[in-house]
Design a protein with these regions (language model features):
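Domain-level signal for Mg2+-assisted phosphodiester chemistry and nucleotide/NA-binding surfaces
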Residues: 2-99, 138
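Nuclease catalytic cores that cleave nucleic-acid phosphodiester bonds
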Residues: 72-170
Length: 170
């Protein structure tokens, strides 16, 4: 028996295929820069140093996007350090974390990216990581070793540790 297709069925099939193509090979990096720099008021230099290390240890593709969140007090120095990123600002307890989580869900990153890299060890992101993984997104966490929450670690399949280079002894 042949099942009749409606316009809605054809549209849903087309958009579903389109979403898969849109996701293919793309990643988004959600960066809680305060957590990565270990400072609530990171300087432009501190952000640049952390990002140099980040780029050295984290695979970044040509189609990758970056979303960076900070509190309002750090907006200018962080904004100077970054170019071509989506910069979010929210103050208060977990303000930057909330801004990143809301952006991920609101912008439907589960449908737009194959891979999400969470640049933070904060346990606040455990629920987001769980949701993304349930949606079929590969989730990686990038964190300082001592800043990685056990709860967040339990929700992801991959962790990359940011370790500052050991100073050369002369």
């Amino acid at each position: 028996m042949i099942t009749p297709t409606t316009r809605i069925d054809r549209f849903q099939a087309r958009t579903s295929r389109g979403r898969r193509r849109l996701r293919s090979g793309r990643a988004v990096h959600l960066l809680d820069i305060e957590n990565l720099t270990r400072s609530t008021r990171p300087t432009t230099l501190a952000v640049a140093e952390v990002m140099t290390l980040y780029r050295r240890v984290v695979p970044i593709g040509p189609m990758d996007q970056f979303v960076v969140a900070v509190n309002h007090g750090a907006l200018v120095p962080v904004g100077i350090a970054f170019h071509g990123v989506q910069l979010l600002a929210r103050s208060g307890p977990d303000g930057a974390d909330q801004a990143l989580a809301e952006a991920a869900r609101g912008d439907r990153m589960d449908q737009r990216f194959d891979r999400v890299v969470i640049g933070s060890g904060d346990g606040y992101f455990a629920d987001l990581a769980c949701w993304l993984a349930e949606c079929g997104v590969h989730v990686t966490v990038v964190s300082q070793r001592e800043s990685l929450s056990r709860r967040l670690r339990a929700e992801v399949s991959a962790v990359i540790t940011l370790e500052p280079p050991v100073a050369q002894v002369a």
